[in-house]
């Protein structure tokens, strides 16, 4: 089981999750997907449902769904949701336990970055801790990624969460990124964290699946 988080929203968590799911399935692994919280519809959940060709109910794969494309805590307020934090945690936990029993491996994908509030002061990182999962951080190769990646890893570690590694999602072609190798070296050295994957496209990627599955 693994929790896929990222340095920001729109960083490619769903894209990377879909590549992981697709290839783990090709390896013969019975893999499932959980998106505990999704705002702005169910596009991410539907993407993985189609890739995995699963009959899992959408309400199971995505127990907390909010209509507006906002931070979950703001969407809860604006939509006047009656759900309490305890009820939210219970719904997510029940979905997680159900899927965990059904599958050999479960990909759990967050929403936004690690510090986005879900409800009140309960952050996405608190959800990772609540579920007792290790994390993989999806990052980008562009200028600024050193700061964003190291801050994300440090925050997770300060919460007592084990970070298995970083996957670089090339939202910008590497040929357009100056000295990206040195950027990656800096992340690994300063953050004492391994880059376990580089995704250039759905067909062109290098991922250490052993680190994902361990």
Curated annotation (Swiss-Prot):
The active site is at residue 35. InterPro entries: DTB_synth_BioD, P-loop_NTPase. It comes from the Archaea. Its cofactor is Mg(2+). It comes from Methanocaldococcus jannaschii (strain ATCC 43067 / DSM 2661 / JAL-1 / JCM 10045 / NBRC 100440). This is ATP-dependent dethiobiotin synthetase BioD. Pfam families: AAA_26. Catalyzes a mechanistically unusual reaction, the ATP-dependent insertion of CO2 between the N7 and N8 nitrogen atoms of 7,8-diaminopelargonic acid (DAPA, also called 7,8-diammoniononanoate) to form a ureido ring.
